[in-house]
């Protein structure tokens, strides 16, 4: 009996060591050597202090900042653990709203967002990414059009010219990888940090 069981036990232990220990350590070690910034979570620092990650969006409020996409993430309701409450950019509970096109809640939210954006910049068409959530609810980027749409509000709140803010947006645009993969985008956290440095409140 021991003779028959021994190969299975040895195989189990060997594969556990290879796939559960050696392989993850090797991949982590290589990533840390070859891509140290990404391996540590693409953390963004300011004045030696971590203020966020380039890969995870965060909520910015106030007219003086650029805003990201709407986030549909939720968190447990402190008053009733069987329910949830809205918690934008909750990285512990990534996901979309799963609301369909016939959902009244989705239609109401879209109408409210569109009305707010039209009041902010009546003459410009509203970029779709400013009213739609991403699949993860944690998207750190917006389109260049989404950033440019917000320029008048930000410039007015900061007391600077729109041209100054447009130049900042232009300098913050990240191109598709290799010119073909993905779309042009603006990282909201990095743009707001550049904004604070160039035009302090």
From Swiss-Prot:
Residues 69-102 are annotated as: Disordered. The chain crosses the membrane at residues 12-34. Residues 81-101 have a biased composition (Polar residues). The keyword Repeat does not apply. Keywords: ATP-binding, Cell inner membrane, Cell membrane, Ion transport, Membrane, Nucleotide-binding, Potassium, Potassium transport, Transmembrane, Transmembrane helix, Transport. It comes from the Bacteria. Pfam families: KdpC. The keyword Cell membrane applies. It is found in: Cell inner membrane. GO terms for cellular component: plasma membrane. It is a single-pass membrane protein. GO terms for molecular function: ATP binding; P-type potassium transmembrane transporter activity. Its main location: membrane. Part of the high-affinity ATP-driven potassium transport (or Kdp) system, which catalyzes the hydrolysis of ATP coupled with the electrogenic transport of potassium into the cytoplasm. This subunit acts as a catalytic chaperone that increases the ATP-binding affinity of the ATP-hydrolyzing subunit KdpB by the formation of a transient KdpB/KdpC/ATP ternary complex. The system is composed of three essential subunits: KdpA, KdpB and KdpC. HAMAP family: KdpC. Belongs to the KdpC family. This is Potassium-transporting ATPase KdpC subunit. It comes from Rhodopseudomonas palustris (strain TIE-1). The gene is kdpC.
